[in-house]
Amino acid sequence: MMEKKAKIIATLGPAIYSEKKLKKIISLGVDAFRINFSHDITGVKQIISRIRKLENKLNKRIAVIADLQGIKLRIGKISSDKLRIKYKQKFTFDTNKKIGNNLRVCFPYSFIINKIKIGSKIFLDDGKFIFKVIEKNKKSLVTRCLSTNCILSSNKSVHIPNIKIPLNRLTKKDKKDISIAKRMGCNWIALSYIQNSDLIKETRKLINSDIGIISKIENKIAIKNIKEIINESDAIMIARGDLAIDIGHSEVPKVQLELIKKCAALSKPVIVATQMLESMIENASPTRAEINDVATAIFQGADVVMLSAETAIGKNPIQSVKTMSKTILSTEKYKKQHIDEFKSSIDAKKDTMKS
């Protein structure tokens, strides 16, 4: 039986914490687990220990990735796991550290608030939800929700187009999390919101030589400096959520292909991530567009594809992994057949020329 070549990363979360589910998704094709350090990691050390035992039991090498929060903007904690914000409702982002509710949430970046203009749009949760600024002062932004079915939870990412973040170094939290990741035995460190190679070099000084660095490409500046970033990194992740907001959704397919080609040319593994099987968070079956998205990444030459909320908090984590694995196998089989056909055609032409 043909085994898949492309790897699958599954994001750790409550949906797959049990040993039974971990064992099942590893047997279905998961090769690595991602820990999102932007969220609460209480109890994760125990889960990693569980993964290491399964690694030995199943005789399969499993990587663990520590995905650092970095300087990516995020909202604070919210009182409910799923807080619904109504369409056209007023909603405030402020510097108050109190737990958020359906009227406001903490946005602890006064230096960013000062830069935002009335009329600006704020994108939350990898661009899923949009808010428009209608009032502001030094400590808060009053917005109107422009999205239907807006459901927020704690620590979700925030992206504001055309606002430059003047930081390009590890935060105190990142440095602390690197120490935690080392103690946990993580194999990889993923760096968020990379702009150039500086952050990679700083991280390299803090980790052992056997820990790899994954640079997440999420903005125009990173694309501009892509060659130096690829050269200094051990792998690249195309984080399409924030990237789409920064460069425009219609530009992402082209940029994805270009980044995959550049990584191949420099012999660096490349990961395609974000919303690959997003509908399977709720639904047992994927959309045809999602299947095509996974297949396209494999056709283009991606070495790894990643599941995020699908495995972390989704209702169908096992089915999501099964779907991704099956799609990879089908696509790789097709690629192999056609490469073999192409080689046979070339050989036949050579024989004809000789005769």
Report each predicted region and the residues it spans.
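Non-catalytic helical/linker scaffolds that mediate oligomerization, partner binding
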Residues: 1-355
